[in-house]
Amino acid sequence: MAGKKRESSLQIALSNQEQWEEALSTKGLQVVDVYQAWCGPCKPTVSLFRKIKNELGDDLLHFAVAESDTIDSLVKYRGKCEPTFLFLAGGELVAVVRGANGPLLQKTIIEQLAAEKKVLNQGSERHVIKDEVLLEEEDEIAPVQAQTEDEELVPSGKSYTVAIIKPDAVAHGKTDEIIMKIQESGFEILANEERTMTESEAREFYQHRAGEEKFQELIQFMSSGPCHILIISKSEEDEDVIPAWREFIGPTDVEIAKKEKPESLRAQYGTEVLYNAVHGSNDREQASRELAFFFPNFKISNESLKELTSVKPERTLALIRPEILKERKDEILQSIKDAGFSIAMQKEVMLTEHQVQEFYKEHINEDYYPALLKQMTSGPVLALALVKDNAVGHWRNMLGPASLSQALSEAPDSLRAQFAPSDSETNQLHGSSTTEEAKKEINFFFPVEHTLATIKPDALEEHRDEILEQIQGAGFTISQIKEANLNREMAEEFYKEHKGKPFFEQLVNYMCRGPCLMMILSKENAVHEWRSLMGPTDPAEAQKVLPDSLRGKFAKSILQNAVHGSSNSDHAMEKIKFIFGDIDLDRIVHESFGETPETSASDISRNAAAQGDDPEQDESKEMEE
């Protein structure tokens, strides 16, 4: 709760026209995060604003968040998916920043605050601007607005989704045939645009899949030729088009589609996973993002917008138990993806008896508990944080009855029935029963962690702003930050585990060359997430497999590889203490995230590291450290 109070006192919430007009009368500089109801304010910038406010300590600097959907003055900002920050002074617009660009935001705040002080103290003229992006959009839309207004409106009460006929199907001349089948099946096509995506556009569109093995191949394929981008709705007003469309196109894997859904579009026109002919949005949030990406000027009726924003994506915990994890993991993960879930986090971990008792403490007195305990400690468990509209309910429905015999007899198509072991009476899949339980269970397996991150001397000098921007864009909170010049003694202690190795002297000399930027980064699963953002140690490998990683972009060599990260939770705690001293990390969690992780969650994290959950944890033995 302390975290929420602190955030609310930092940013005033504006949700109607009256509050907006009142805010315009505020003396000084007002920085307003204008957001859409479906996506909420830009959270990664909160820690930056708090840091700036604390450092400047200026009563003339104010922060606010404003919901464009409910404020008349912000009508032109509706339907924009890019974070937008308006700088207001004297009730007038003096600057605009688009995107969560931390360094640019900080620079603009400092410059505009100084300018406003000159206006107030010296009578200087205030430089008022107009939002040029909005003016350009108005110029583009005005000539055709009258004739397209009715065509560009999603009818009241209807849901919509974005569909793509991919380059393979277009190249084979199947576009008209696919469109005819779409219409014959009761779908309405509200818009149809042929478009060839650039690699940059494809990379942005599929950024949520950047960690996948075939990501680069996907980008090259999607930018290899023209696609047809469609906006699809259903004839019946009360029918949700998204699940209907996903059912119609079939499973992602073409072979599975041919076997299980032979009449689906992917079964008929796809050739393999990437070349599967068509794309469909996973959920309403993704549909809205994709609509804004391809059709930024497309209008949505107020009723449709209200329906869209009434359902918020939620998270739930899924567990794949040991008996089927080894043999059928890929099949289960594919079923999860085909159902429209996004996997936000995953962790494979060996549980101790104590951890199982803590997690299932409400089941200890049940007759089935001994068998459950034996099952849960017999091998690694895969924990997944799943994201989707009504994720808890959807996942529970897919699982079927908890009783394996009941699942087999009454719900043979449920996941528990499909993946039932031959010699066990314990079902092999778990799902949270309520949203509150999901929150607790996700926190149990994926606690808010802290890791030490370092921007090394050469990268700090050349790429500081870009690296910080990418860190904040990845959702990390920079809980502590300081620039430090390591002397030889400090550098040797920092890398003491490498003492005696051939590269030790070279590494120490390099780290003493100039200042480093030391940070405590906080996030769920922070150690693993930071290592993923850094990328492989060798920049040649990083550029090949993760070109958008920090090392893929900014590393020069294995020694000069831009950034450093702790290899596991224990290593992170040791290095944080060395750099920042005795710091209250629990207080940081409480203030930044409004909650304190369960004790058992920390145990889970340490146990995962001990079991080798992080495939890069042994990298501490290598030169990158």
From Swiss-Prot:
Major localization listed first in the record, in broad terms: cytoplasm
A GO cellular component annotation in the UniProt record: cytoskeleton
UniProt entry keywords in alphabetical sequence: Cell projection, Cytoplasm, Cytoskeleton
Bias (Acidic residues) ranges: 613-625
Cellular localization per UniProt: Cytoplasm, Cytoskeleton, Cilium axoneme; Dynein axonemal particle
Subunit details: Monomer and homodimer.
Top-rank lineage group of the source organism: Eukaryota
GO biological process, one term: GTP biosynthetic process
Assigned protein family: Belongs to the NDK family.
Positions of region (NDK): 158-302
GO MF entry, a single one: nucleoside diphosphate kinase activity
Region spans: Disordered: 594-625
Gene giving rise to this polypeptide: nme9
Protein name: Thioredoxin domain-containing protein 6
Pfam assignment, any one: Thioredoxin
UniProt source species: Xenopus laevis
UniProt function note: May be a regulator of microtubule physiology.
